[in-house]
């Protein structure tokens, strides 16, 4: 494998995820990395797809958006998704750039996914690249 990265991106809040994908893919291209993108329904499914492909890539980038609602669902999805992604990275000794937004409102998500502002997809890609060096 020649530094091939898998971007796993959640379709929930698709416009946000699309911008995160753009930030990540541009960064990977600029740094000479090959990559593929697989979309999953939501953030909770990201760890499954990473585990399923753990032996096929040099690193992963997890992208998605979780926005707080009126129930405990936000905490469950945010905490369990984050924990399992970290577990996979440590247990399999493989870099996983974390670009799953956990926001209190849509405005925060828009800012953090804006390609011209704080694009967290770009930051997740840079983290993965740095860990591969």
Question: Model segments located where?
Answer:
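A charged, well-structured terminal subsegment
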Residues: 118-133
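Phosphate-binding/catalytic loops
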Residues: 104-119
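Short, acidic/small-residue loops that bind anionic groups at enzyme active sites
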Residues: 75-102
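Glycine-rich phosphate-binding loop
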Residues: 48-85
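Glycine-rich phosphate/diphosphate-binding loop of Rossmann-like nucleotide-binding domains
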Residues: 2-37
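Short, ordered loop/turn segments at secondary-structure junctions
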Residues: 11-12, 65-66, 101-105
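Active-site rim loops that border cofactor/substrate pockets in soluble metabolic enzymes
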Residues: 25-56
